């Protein structure tokens, strides 16, 4: 989810970010590369499974064919082959190398990252991981931004609440269900929260996944709403009593900032990039059942500390804009051209 938002937001702002008064204008061409069988729209088609397993030499040749002779080429995911010059690549995280239930990494990706003219990492944490595990030298750290829709988000309308079944007071977990999301701990923590806050529900949104279903289906006070229409997501966040992010490992943690932008307090694990993104504007907890339960119970108490957390969160989210991120990307693009 975060990687897709990143691609759309940076691509939308690339031309404006590269515009410098008095200098020749840049032309931005966007290649939306899809597999041959993908039903999604795209202006380039490749046999992606074969490209992913191709030799390093073959991938370089494919890159020459795919990108042409631009001054800089920004690969926004590691599946795409490298450019022959001006090669920029983004690392959102290195989970493919660390977690067996994630998609396996492209065989040549680590070497291609080391050979790239520039590597952009979305957090200091990811940059340190890329250096330590992949041997990437001098990565550029450029934080993600927050979609403006979350700053202006109104709570869900009554008909949308009824359609989703979410009610008035709920804790929201939004995103994937891979092992690093730590849903087992959230499932272990929830009964203690439910006993203490019986009027509160746990709402879990995200694409269907057997782990999420196994852990939460039929659990008292828990509700699986599946993949929510994108137009409803800001309202779903804004209507929440709090957002919980118990992950063991995140390359950035965009749901933290989206909640803060929508004036919703956050409980997040004190792991990976989450403290870097949240700053002092979230309740940071150990990623254990006891830690998560205590954090959720605390954030749902009616006291001035929670109100202060909401104000601090809003201010924190305002520091992360896609305009700033795009300008910093443009500096990297110019540096390799």
Predicted regions and their residues:
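Carbohydrate transferase catalytic cores enriched for Leloir-type hexosyltransferases
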Residues: 1-337
């Amino acid at each position: 989810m975060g990687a897709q938002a990143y691609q759309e937001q940076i691509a939308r702002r690339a031309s404006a970010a590269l515009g410098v008064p008095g200098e020749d204008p840049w032309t931005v061409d966007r290649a939306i590369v899809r597999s041959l069988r993908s039903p999604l729209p795209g202006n380039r088609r490749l046999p992606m499974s074969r490209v992913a397993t191709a030799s390093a030499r073959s991938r370089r040749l494919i890159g020459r064919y795919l990108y042409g002779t631009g001054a800089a080429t920004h690969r926004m995911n590691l599946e795409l082959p490298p450019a022959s010059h001006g090669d920029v690549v983004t690392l959102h995280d290195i989970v493919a190398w660390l977690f067996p239930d994630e998609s396996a990494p492209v065989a040549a990706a680590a070497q291609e990252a080391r050979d790239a003219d520039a590597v952009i990492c979305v957090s200091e944490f990811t940059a340190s991981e890329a250096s330590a595990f992949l041997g990437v030298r001098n990565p550029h750290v450029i934080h993600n931004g927050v979609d403006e829709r979350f700053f202006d988000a109104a709570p869900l309308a009554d008909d949308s609440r009824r359609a989703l079944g979410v009610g008035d007071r709920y804790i929201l977990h939004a995103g994937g269900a891979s092992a690093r999301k730590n849903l087992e701990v959230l499932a272990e923590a929830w009964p203690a929260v439910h006993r203490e806050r019986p009027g509160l529900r746990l709402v879990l949104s995200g694409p269907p996944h057997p782990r999420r279903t196994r852990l939460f289906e039929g659990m008292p006070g828990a509700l699986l709403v599946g993949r929510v229409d994108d137009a409803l997501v800001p309202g779903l966040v804004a209507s929440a009593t709090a957002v919980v992010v118990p992950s063991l490992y995140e390359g950035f943690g965009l749901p933290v900032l989206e909640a803060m932008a929508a004036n919703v307090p956050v409980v997040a694990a004190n792991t990976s990039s989450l403290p870097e993104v949240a700053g002092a504007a979230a309740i940071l907890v150990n990623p254990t059942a006891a830690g998560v339960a205590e954090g959720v119970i605390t954030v749902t108490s009616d006291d001035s500390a929670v109100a202060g957390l909401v104000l601090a969160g809003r201010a924190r989210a305002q520091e992360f804009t896609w305009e700033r991120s795009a300008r910093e990307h443009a500096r990297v693009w110019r540096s390799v051209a």
